[in-house]
Amino acid sequence: KEFLFVPISSYSPSAFAFRVTSWSMKEGGILPGDIAIAEKEREPKDGDIVLSKAREGEGRMELRRLRIRGSLMELWPENDSMGITRSQNLEICGILTEIRRKY
């Protein structure tokens, strides 16, 4: 196991960290192996990078850029080889606030 120590005062109590496993945001500089820090309690805005999943079932979580079009949410990868996800039934699990990378 690997631990990431950060000052607790730097983040809200709803913050959480996860390891990026997908190439979906590579053109935005977010790579597999990076540690992403997200906030659960923030309200998502158009253009935010979010961690999301489909509301029904145990869907796969995706890190993508959020575009809001009325009641429709679009999740845009920053990787030209991947498609856009469009849905009215997405759960936003967190808003990306920081990326950490170990060299």
Predicted segments with their positions:
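Acidic/glycine-rich C-terminal interaction modules and beta/coil loop segments
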Residues: E2-Y103
